């Protein structure tokens, strides 16, 4: 996938078109794809399959972006995305996963109050290590769903938006019977903690108007048992990918696009697909020439970027209950904890601590060792005899210069159509990524589908410009292979 020592001159020759060649009607159009995550790889795959000359420029020393499967434990664990949200044939990634025969472990069915988990296999504890009864957890869950229903009524009555936290306060004032005390209050805060984890953001910043605008595919949610790496590797096979190429400038002209890297290398093509994380676009690290129009820049500025991290603890034996997840309830959502039990799905003795929002930001200030110790201290609150982990992994999506956040979400007082505004092409620049998916933001299949869509838009626009619409894309209908789903 790397350049194999090609010189910059050779690279230009590979993707640039001379004046004489432009006169040839049958030449292959050229596209630069900026970003080698799921969106960028799916865009490049689609364009190359349509006989376009494509080069992918990726700032990291690996492909995948926020899809990152690590093998240092001797088996795969995902530091980034790990779920397929919507285990069904309608999911655009289902065909790829099915053809590869990759197993999924279903953690929830449709319409679960916990989004990616059902209340079937869990253990919640208070900070003293006492397990919370299933009856109370179920009762508080029903209360939480009732609160969300009341929030929808509150927001529909008002023109102005508000945060989920503000909406909670209004609901409690109107319906004091929904306000809980003692242990029940702490369990309610744990439900709120899991809602914050879904959006990778704090309730004080999540829009009450837009929190439920994404489309949830049927079939529930499935963990990728072998990780997402096989998917990204398959899609990237045969692509010209240049790693460690950080972009600093994107210049658009009528005749084409010129991209400049921090090392001073330049790449020229007919068009470019920009498949960069929203956090990177927000940072201003990349200069656009000419500047992006106000409507496009506002879309970048006004979408929220959340943070959810993973602290993955690997043990030499299993000492915890045989449930899908463990949790610690507390007086505030910030003080609650959530551990995903990978042993249930993969048979490996691994627990994954997953902080989000401000808690994730605070933990990112710690060293890897301190972060792992913090996660283990949360585990010791509920399992005081827990053995120490033999090794650990820590993600830092918020401070990673290549991501600067985990995924997008709707913030207060900003419209949901910002996703679509970010997606809309700008001359010969096309945009892809989970933050351009109004239906499936924050998901791998959302990123994948926007990459395909950007590639199709790019193909049509470029071929129209060169009068080559007869150069049709060869489509192969993927064989429908059933997904391998388990639930132990």
Curated annotation (Swiss-Prot):
Enzyme class: oxidoreductase
Protein name as catalogued: Polyamine oxidase 3
Annotated family: Belongs to the flavin monoamine oxidase family.
Cofactor: FAD
Amino-acid positions noted as binding FAD in the UniProt annotation, renumbered to this chain: 58, 66, 434
Activity control: Inhibited by guazatine, aminoguanidine and putrescine.
EC number annotated for this UniProt entry: 1.5.3.17
Alphabetized GO MF terms: N(1)-acetylpolyamine oxidase (3-acetamidopropanal-forming) activity; polyamine oxidase activity; spermine oxidase activity; thermospermine oxidase activity
Keyword Oxidoreductase: yes
Co-factor: note: Binds 1 FAD per subunit.
Tissues expressing the protein: Expressed at similar levels in all tissues tested. Highest expression is seen in siliques.
Lineage: superkingdom: Eukaryota
Pathway assigned to this chain's UniProt record: Amine and polyamine degradation; spermine degradation; Amine and polyamine degradation; spermidine degradation
One GO cellular component term noted in the UniProt record for this chain: peroxisome
């Amino acid at each position: 996938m790397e350049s194999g020592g090609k010189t910059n001159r050779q690279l230009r020759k590979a993707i640039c078109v001379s004046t004489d060649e432009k006169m040839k009607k049958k030449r292959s159009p050229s596209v630069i794809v900026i970003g080698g995550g799921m969106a960028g790889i799916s865009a490049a795959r689609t364009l190359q399959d349509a006989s376009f000359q494509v080069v992918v420029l990726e700032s990291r020393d690996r492909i995948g972006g926020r899809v990152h499967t690590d093998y240092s434990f001797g088996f795969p664990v995902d530091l980034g995305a790990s779920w397929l949200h919507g285990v069904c044939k309608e999911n655009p990634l289902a065909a790829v996963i099915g053809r590869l025969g990759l197993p999924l472990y279903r953690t929830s069915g449709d319409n679960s109050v916990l989004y990616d988990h059902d209340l079937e296999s869990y253990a919640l504890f208070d900070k003293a290590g006492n397990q919370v009864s299933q009856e109370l957890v179920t009762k508080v869950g029903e209360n939480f769903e009732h609160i969300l229903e009341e929030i929808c009524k509150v927001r529909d009555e008002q023109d102005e938006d508000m945060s989920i936290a503000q909406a909670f306060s209004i609901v409690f004032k109107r319906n004091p019977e929904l306000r809980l005390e003692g242990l029940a209050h702490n369990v309610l805060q744990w439900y709120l903690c899991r809602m914050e984890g879904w959006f990778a953001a704090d309730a004080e910043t999540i829009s009450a108007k837009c929190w439920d605008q994404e489309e949830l595919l049927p079939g529930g949610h499935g963990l990728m048992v072998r990780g997402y790496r096989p998917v990204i590797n398959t899609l990237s096979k045969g692509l010209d990918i240049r790693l460690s190429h950080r972009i600093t400038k994107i210049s658009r002209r009528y005749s084409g696009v010129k991209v400049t890297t921090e090392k001073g290398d330049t790449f020229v093509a007919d068009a470019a697909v920009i498949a960069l994380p929203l956090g990177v676009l927000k940072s201003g690290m990349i200069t656009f020439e000419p500047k992006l129009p106000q409507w496009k820049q506002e879309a970048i500025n006004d979408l929220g970027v959340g943070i959810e991290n993973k602290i993955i603890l690997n043990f030499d034996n299993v000492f915890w209950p045989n449930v899908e997840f463990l949790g610690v309830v507390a007086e505030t959502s910030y003080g609650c904890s959530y551990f995903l039990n990978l042993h249930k799905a993969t048979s490996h003795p691994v627990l994954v601590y997953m902080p989000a929002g401000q808690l994730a930001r605070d933990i990112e200030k710690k060293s890897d060792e301190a972060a792992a110790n913090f996660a283990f201290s949360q585990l010791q609150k509920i399992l005081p005899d827990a053995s120490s982990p033999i090794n650990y992994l820590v993600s830092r999506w918020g401070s990673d210069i290549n991501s600067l956040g985990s995924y997008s979400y709707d913030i207060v007082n900003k419209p949901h159509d910002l996703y679509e505004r970010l997606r809309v092409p700008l001359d010969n620049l096309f945009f892809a990524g989970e933050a351009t998916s109004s239906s499936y933001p924050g998901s791998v299949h959302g990123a994948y589908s926007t990459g395909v869509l950007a590639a199709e838009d790019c193909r049509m626009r470029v071929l129209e410009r060169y009068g080559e619409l007869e150069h049709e894309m060869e489509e192969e209908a993927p064989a429908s292979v059933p997904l391998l789903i388990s639930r132990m």
